[in-house]
Swiss-Prot record:
Record: disease: Mitochondrial complex I deficiency, nuclear type 15: A form of mitochondrial complex I deficiency, the most common biochemical signature of mitochondrial disorders, a group of highly heterogeneous conditions characterized by defective oxidative phosphorylation, which collectively affects 1 in 5-10000 live births. Clinical disorders have variable severity, ranging from lethal neonatal disease to adult-onset neurodegenerative disorders.
Induction notes from the record: Expression is low in quiescent cells and is induced in exponentially proliferating cultures. Expression is also induced when prolactin is added to stationary cells. Induced by dietary differentiating agents such as butyrate and retinoic acid.
Species per Swiss-Prot/TrEMBL record: Homo sapiens (Human)
Protein name: NADH dehydrogenase [ubiquinone] 1 alpha subcomplex assembly factor 4
Gene behind the chain: NDUFAF4
Residue positions where Phosphoserine is found in the record: S35
Function description: Involved in the assembly of mitochondrial NADH:ubiquinone oxidoreductase complex (complex I). May be involved in cell proliferation and survival of hormone-dependent tumor cells. May be a regulator of breast tumor cell invasion.
Keyword field contains NAD: no
Biological process (GO), any one: mitochondrial respiratory chain complex I assembly
Lineage: Eukaryota, Metazoa, Chordata, Craniata, Vertebrata
GO molecular function: calmodulin binding
Amino acid sequence: MGALVIRGIRNFNLENRAEREISKMKPSVAPRHPSTNSLLREQISLYPEVKGEIARKDEKLLSFLKDVYVDSKDPVSSLQVKAAETCQEPKEFRLPKDHHFDMINIKSIPKGKISIVEALTLLNNHKLFPETWTAEKIMQEYQLEQKDVNSLLKYFVTFEVEIFPPEDKKAIRSK
């Protein structure tokens, strides 16, 4: 709604305003410095043909300019670019492992990626049984790349929750 009002105000009396601007006096050439005037007079007196050359129109150049044909095309709109981007190769997917965490929302996982639950599970398995859950086994089990698995095992760890008893009470030891 606001665009209609702005467009109406912008286009109001447009022709009269344009004609007024066109009919204004054109700006005159800036005055030359006095030292430049003397140099120009000296050069024109030495080379009088230059003054005629400046005022003369070059017919050959004008014919070249008339032969110039400019063919332009609008840039590709963003909608066409987005449409081209959406046409990608279909990715390979796999089903999530171990459905015991009630992962209702996750139907499939792209190959080379894992869910949060799977990441926590494999990190915990590797921490508890490092000789069984090696990087190679994790790579094969979850279809990941070797460098990703190595980085995951190197830089991520699961939390250990330890509850320390208050210092004034004795801890109950389990048998």
